[in-house]
């Protein structure tokens, strides 16, 4: 029996937008429009269709192990105010719109991510799951394909207990395991420091994404951040990789241009081409505690993150 499922076909094609559906149908010798209608949700693939598609998709890089579990990504920086939470919420929303099932984990005691998504006073939150063995990670549906594990200031007390507890670094990883099969992506919004919570997040992750404001005050701590990533990789999570760095709050001036070029020439990993510009809509959406796409879906700010999402998806397919 063919191991390929309709869900995996859809996931693979969403991760590979360059593949032409009509070409796949022709190579697999299945009726024209079969795959296109499946992507549109108007029909289902039969076992015969899946069997015919399997060798064709395999030729283009498909394997059964690609989408067994979610890819867990920590969004990190040692400094606050560099667009980390905005990137987490906006990237998650953009992925969800493309049909991927996304879980956002608020691991910042300030709870800004939860507040942006309209969860101001969570009754069940991440801290309770981390401190109590029998308590599962809370998962709240925010919108279609987008879910949240919320937090507030209670998480600060939890961090102190995690520092003192045996296996504290493993708590988040263990709590995520039961839900990984339900999602395509898990994005963790880390606190603006290199503390126990950030280490726990990286230990639970496949990779991390760095957000960086191109100003000296933000760039100065980049080496310390990368050193901490290497410490986690060496001592806790050998599979951890850096997906890359995305510049945020970018202004069109010579100072930002010079800093960006310096960073690009010095870091040993990808710097994404898409930059998140310094736009007033980002500030307005933060004041109103609203995701940028909900605040102004047609704005340049929302388009900025949709473009980054497209580039990020293309990158993920390459590394897989």
Language model segments and positions:
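Short, Lys/Arg-enriched N-terminal segments with co-localized hydrophobic residues
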Residues: 1-2
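Alpha-helical residues within the helix-turn-helix
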Residues: 26
């Amino acid at each position: 029996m063919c191991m390929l499922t309709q869900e995996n076909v859809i996931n693979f094609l969403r991760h590979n937008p360059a593949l032409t559906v009509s070409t796949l149908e022709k190579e697999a010798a299945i009726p024209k429009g079969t795959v296109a209608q499946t992507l549109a949700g108007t029909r289902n693939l039969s076992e015969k269709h899946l069997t015919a598609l399997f060798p064709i998709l395999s030729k283009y890089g498909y394997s059964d192990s690609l989408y067994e579990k979610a890819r867990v990504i920590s969004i990190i920086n040692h400094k606050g105010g560099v667009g980390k939470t905005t990137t987490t919420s906006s990237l998650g929303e953009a992925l969800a719109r493309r049909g991927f099932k996304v879980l956002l984990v608020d691991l910042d005691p300030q709870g800004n991510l939860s507040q942006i998504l309209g969860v101001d006073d969570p009754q069940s939150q991440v801290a309770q799951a981390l401190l109590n063995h029998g308590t599962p990670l809370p998962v709240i549906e925010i919108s279609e394909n987008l879910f949240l594990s919320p937090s507030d200031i209670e998480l600060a007390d939890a961090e102190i207990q995690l520092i003192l507890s045996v296996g504290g670094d493993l708590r988040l990883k263990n709590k995520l395991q039961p839900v990984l099969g339900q999602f395509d992506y898990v994005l963790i919004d880390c606190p603006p420091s290199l503390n126990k919570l950030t280490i726990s997040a990286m230990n639970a992750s496949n990779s991390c994404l760095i957000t960086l404001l191109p100003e000296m005050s933000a760039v100065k701590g980049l080496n310390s951040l990368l050193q901490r990533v290497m410490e986690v990789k060496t001592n806790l999570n050998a599979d951890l990789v850096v997906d890359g760095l995305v510049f945020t709050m970018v202004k069109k001036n010579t100072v930002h241009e010079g800093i960006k070029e310096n960073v690009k020439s010095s870091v040993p990993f990808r710097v994404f081409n898409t930059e998140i510009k310094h736009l007033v809509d980002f500030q307005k959406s933060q004041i109103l505690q609203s995701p940028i796409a909900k605040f102004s879906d047609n704005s340049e700010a929302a388009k900025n993150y949709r473009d980054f999402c497209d580039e990020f998806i293309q990158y993920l397919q390459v590394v897989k």
